[in-house]
Amino acid sequence: MKFSTALSVALFALAKMVIADSEEFGLVSIRSGSDLQYLSVYSDNGTLKLGSGSGSFEATITDDGKLKFDDDKYAVVNEDGSFKEGSESDAATGFSIKDGHLNYKSSSGFYAIKDGSSYIFSSKQSDDATGVAIRPTSKSGSVAADFSPSDSSSSSSASASSASASSSTKHSSSIESVETSTTVETSSASSPTASVISQITDGQIQAPNTVYEQTENAGAKAAVGMGAGALAVAAAYLL
């Protein structure tokens, strides 16, 4: 069992190491036929906005579903649904990339709220909000690959659990095999010696002088056999 537990812990640690963040990507808004098409996400005194100004972000999605920017800050959701920059401890979780779009809480719908010459970036709809999609664009200009941290974690955990269960099963099987072998050997060693009565060629019955019986404490005791004369009489009677 100690071996099985150690192996399980090692596999779980390895699985955590294998899980990685997404590739780095830019955040580009998509709203065909409007001035919201191809705007970038940037920070205005900590508030995340959509605009065409400089200072746009590159971002990654961490292995626990947080949106991390290239200034080492994270996307945080305010009570009204708008996004701001903040620390990892306050970061929102639930980000992923699916079908070429940034998702939050399994939804690809985001909203832009007019604020002067730019737009406040939000996760909630309001009367003055316009729906947009966010395309994660890699440094090469292509759409970033799909990334789902929850699926990656589940798969790795399941692999580790499966390997741990397999190891535990093998260990138990080995113990059972040893126990079975020991039981068989013990039974063979404690089996009583059976006395066989045989018939000789002239038709008389011949029995050994000593019969061994198994006692309750697995010891053998000898019982004195019948005398030769009594045996002959019994044989004649039977014939």
Curated annotation (Swiss-Prot):
The keyword Ligase does not apply. Transmembrane segments: none annotated. PROSITE patterns: PIR_REPEAT_2. The keyword Cytoplasm does not apply. PIR1/2/ repeats lie at residues 194-212. Extensively O-glycosylated. The record marks Q204 as: Covalent attachment to cell wall glycan. GO terms for molecular function: structural constituent of cell wall. Induction: Positively regulated by cell integrity signaling through MPK1 in response to cell wall perturbation. Induction is dependent on transcription factor RLM1. Down-regulated during anaerobic growth. Up-regulated by low pH. Pfam families: PIR. Residues 131-196 are annotated as: Disordered. Residues 1-20 form the signal peptide. Residues 142-196 have a biased composition (Low complexity). Keywords: Cell wall, Glycoprotein, GPI-anchor, Lipoprotein, Membrane, Secreted, Signal. One of its GO terms (cellular component) is extracellular region. It is found in: Secreted, Cell wall; Membrane. A lipid is attached at N217 (GPI-anchor amidated asparagine). It is a lipid-anchor; GPI-anchor. GO terms for biological process: ascospore-type prospore membrane formation; fungal-type cell wall organization. Residues 218-239 form a propeptide. The strains CLIB 410 and CLIB 630 haplotype Ha2, contain large deletions that remove most of the protein. Present with 67000 wall-bound molecules/cell in log phase YPD medium. Component of the cell wall. Belongs to the SRP1/TIP1 family. This is Cell wall protein CWP1. It comes from Saccharomyces cerevisiae (strain ATCC 204508 / S288c).
